[in-house]
């Protein structure tokens, strides 16, 4: 899936679109995507001057965006202005290596389970053979204007 297909599936845009390409997609099971991290990322200006590091929350967001692509594919749906896919929880997030300009972040997501409209994913972000981040992510789809039931 190239960037043109990705922007049809995700509502995010620059500077918050954090998936550049999908390289593997196995329906109802897993996805592998890429985020090319460049020195032009706006967050590097302040995180950190002289030693730029991708913020961990943005690595988690990149994983969540890849999870959204997998979920929409599994449901056979194309998102529209009436439905949004929300990140609703993160468990066990661990950061094991910094992600720096020039790195290619590989985002690997597998579906763990779907129950009561909540999707649970296992996510792994890596650079080469090194794990940068791992986490369990929970997401759900809501219609715009639908009340929060939490």
Curated annotation (Swiss-Prot):
Q: What is its EC number?
A: 4.2.1.59
Matching entries from Gene3D superfamilies are given as: Hotdog Thioesterase (3.10.129.10)
Q: Does the keyword GTP-binding apply?
A: no
Q: Does the keyword Cell wall biogenesis/degradation apply?
A: no
**Catalyses which reaction?**
a (3R)-hydroxyacyl-[ACP] = a (2E)-enoyl-[ACP] + H2O
Q: Give any Gene Ontology cellular component.
A: cytoplasm
A GO molecular function annotation here is:
(3R)-hydroxyacyl-[acyl-carrier-protein] dehydratase activity
Coiled-coil positions: none
Localization recorded for this chain is: Cytoplasm
Which GO biological process annotations does it have? fatty acid biosynthetic process; lipid A biosynthetic process
Q: Where is the active site?
A: 47
Supply the alphabetized keyword list. Answer: Cytoplasm, Lipid A biosynthesis, Lipid biosynthesis, Lipid metabolism, Lyase
Q: What is its main location?
A: cytoplasm
Q: Which domain of life is it from?
A: Bacteria
Q: What does this protein do?
A: Involved in unsaturated fatty acids biosynthesis. Catalyzes the dehydration of short chain beta-hydroxyacyl-ACPs and long chain saturated and unsaturated beta-hydroxyacyl-ACPs.
For this protein, the record's NCBIfam families field holds: fabZ, PRK00006.1
**Entry's family note:** Belongs to the thioester dehydratase family. FabZ subfamily.
What name does the UniProt record give this protein? 3-hydroxyacyl-[acyl-carrier-protein] dehydratase FabZ
In its UniProt entry, the species of origin is given as: Verminephrobacter eiseniae (strain EF01-2)
Q: What is the lineage of its organism?
A: Bacteria, Pseudomonadati, Pseudomonadota, Betaproteobacteria, Burkholderiales
- Gene name of the record: fabZ
């Amino acid at each position: 899936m190239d960037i043109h297909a990705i922007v049809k599936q995700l509502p995010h845009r620059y500077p918050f679109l954090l998936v550049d390409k999908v390289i593997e997609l196995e329906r109802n099971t897993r996805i592998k995507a890429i985020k090319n991290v460049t020195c032009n990322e706006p967050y590097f200006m302040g995180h950190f001057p002289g030693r730029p590091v991708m913020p961990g929350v943005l690595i988690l967001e990149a994983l969540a965006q890849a999870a959204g692509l997998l979920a929409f594919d599994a449901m056979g749906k194309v998102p529209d202005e009436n439905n949004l896919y929300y990140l609703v929880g993160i468990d066990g997030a661990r950061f094991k290596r910094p992600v720096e300009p020039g790195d290619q972040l590989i985002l690997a997501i597998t579906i763990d389970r779907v129950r009561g409209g909540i999707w649970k994913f296992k996510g792994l972000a890596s650079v080469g053979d090194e794990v940068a981040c791992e986490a369990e992510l929970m997401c759900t789809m809501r219609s715009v204007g639908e009340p929060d039931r939490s």
